[in-house]
Amino acid sequence: MFENLCTLPLSSELFTQALHPTEPILSVGLSSGHVQCFRLPAAEAAAEDEDGDTSVVSTGTSTIDTEWRTRRHKGSCRTLGYNHDGEVLYSAGTDSLLKAAASSTGQVTSKILIPNTNTDKLDPPTLLHALSPQTLLLTTDSCALHLYDLRDNSSFKSGKPAQTHYPHDDYISSLSPLPPTEMSTSGFSKQWITTGGTTLAVTDLRRGVLVKSEDQEEELLSSVFVGGLPARGKYGREKVCVGNGNGVITLWEKGVWDDQSERIIVDGGGKAGGESLDAMIAMPEELEGGYGGKCVVVGCGDGSVRIVRVGGTKGVVEDMKHDDIEAVVAVGFDVEGRLISGGGDTVKVWQEKVEEEEEEEEEEEQEDIEDNDDVMGGGGKHALERDSDDSDARADSSDEEDGGRKKRKKKKKGKKNQVGNGILKFKGME
């Protein structure tokens, strides 16, 4: 179970977010063209500063600090992505510029104009992804999928991609890398899944577009690869989960890309259809224990964040609210294992809920054991042979001790109920 740790207000509408691979750092791209980088507090520090007397965590160790903020693009910033070591932050905007910046300072180190092979007009980007230290993928409104070789500085500076493919007839809405094969020598992905319009496609770094699915007759919006699923009948252990525009997740067997194999209803929506599933991320393995199987986190068009079990008994296992109106357009997990959801003009940080009740029960059981030892320890056989009057006296004493424990338990519960979800203090906000 997750609980909301804090809410981070933004100066304008969120279009995209990216999480640093090794540090608790969040970068956001806004409709105003700004890119802003925040440092989140360490999970341990935030937990230590919570107490029952206040709902505001305001100590210096638990603030969200602005590392830097800049107007990076004219128009909106549509997409962001870190490279594999987190040293470089790539951004692309409706000005059709792709920029690389030092992630620690925000200083631009290189920029290119995204080409449009069909017309002389600008071709705004939709997604970017650093597939490996050598390859950057960029998709555009014109359905193009550009591959930039980062080892060839002259190509990157001139804005000419090493390869361009057209896997779909509509703009590319999601991009998910497939894991490298056992025969891979580099350890990096060379194939990836894309969705665009009503189709799914697989593209290879060396061979281009390998396969394109049948028309699904429903809009495909988000996707993520999930491995380690339980094998069941004809279904394998590796699948791609695809979020649709009608509130349904479709499951696709790896290697069987012509059509979907299973469906999970996330939002029924009645006759009008369900809410769109705009963003999706696989849940880290260390957080899956409480949900009984492999799960994905989905950002929905109604402002909810839903955890969906895709292995075993499938279905929604938790429903959280990010916003009452605005859609959730981005979800991800930071290096501390916290869930970050973004939509509208806010970002929310969610942390796995600590089961305080279980801890209290363990403490009470330990108190019972100690109390019983006190009663039995002094008398031995002689205590058991006392007359009935002594037994009645011990019973009365035991009732008083039990009453004391119940009072202590009530006090603990009272204190627990005073704890609220904190709103962190923010530094460097404009």
UniProtKB/Swiss-Prot annotation:
Q: Which residues cross the membrane?
A: none
Q: Please note every region of biased composition (Acidic residues).
A: 356-374
Q: Quote a single Gene Ontology cellular component term.
A: nucleolus
Name where it's found. Answer: Nucleus, Nucleolus
Residue spans with biased composition (Basic residues)? 405-416
Disordered: annotated segments = 356-430
Record key words, sorted: Nucleus, Repeat, WD repeat
InterPro entries assigned: WD40/YVTN_repeat-like_dom_sf, WD40_repeat_dom_sf, WDR55_POC1
Protein name from the UniProt record: WD repeat-containing protein jip5
Give the source species.
Botryotinia fuckeliana (strain B05.10) (Noble rot fungus)
